[in-house]
Amino acid sequence: MSEGRAPEAVVWDLLRGAIMTRVLGLVVDLGIPAALAAGPKPVDTLAVETGADAETLHRLLRALASEGVFTELEPGVFGHTEASELLVGGTGWAEFAHLFGGVWHRAAGGIQADGREPAFERIHGTDYWSWLAAHPEEREIFDRAMAEGRERRTDRLEAFAWRGDETVVDVGGGNGSLLVELLERRPGLRGIVLDLPETVRDEEALGERIEFVEGSFFERVPRGDVYVLGTVLHDWDDESAARILRTIRRSASGDSHLLVLDAVMRPGNEPDGSKWLDVLMLAVLNGKERTEAQWRELLAAGGFEPVRFHEALIEAVPAADG
């Protein structure tokens, strides 16, 4: 948001954004947030515990502290702020810092305007999903990051008029965390998670009411009453996203519902974080964020008709002629 700010400040914030992201990711990967979990420590102690150079670490933490991430309580002694506590672990924010400051950061640095393959593929020689399959430790980090905010996403699902006894198919549901949260709130529901075999999941957390089905959403989707796509379609270009929707449409009955948990990008110059996420999708996956008009067009191509647009939730039903 630039209204009321000096033009130079607007440009400067954009210029320094890349290095801020990299520094945050580096500090998280060093384990600094966890090292400070028990209380403030001198930077010399942190350097010994994490294998970093003390002077370099001091400069990195000082820069982050100026943005409210960590605080320098006295010269050379750092502690947590509410913002840095999010990075200790277990919430997904540490994983996002690792991704944004690492492999996604390198992909963003390779963005070109030629409309060809994503920068990630140009750099690594393979697509992101194949790369994750070959790097299981990164796949696990990615899945934990995607689980961040599951309570918020589940809150959005409450806008749907649940009957209470539906079978819910979470298409591309990763480790199943979204369905776990939903079924805890609605004990009458039954869940099915569809995702690739290499997806890391917690069988104990899934429980008896959730079945994990291995497979590709480009090929086959289990039958259900409600299909959920939680931040899946933005990973794909229009043609691929329409293929996913058509696969679901083949399994859906006439009274099934589709719930899409994805951003509805604001048009024009309105400030909207999803516009920057859209550029990240371009760099890493050749995916995209979409406006309401673009969502309507995509749903129609996939055999669905939108019923209503909630905040970050699109409700649709099979089109009569789908």
Model-derived features: where do they sit?
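Conserved Class I S-adenosyl-L-methionine-dependent methyltransferase catalytic core
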Residues: 2, 7-42, 48-49, 54-166
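C-terminal lobe and adjacent flexible extensions of AdoMet/dcAdoMet transferase-like proteins
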Residues: 314-322
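Residue-level recognition of alpha-helix initiation/capping sites
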Residues: 27, 55-56, 173, 239, ...
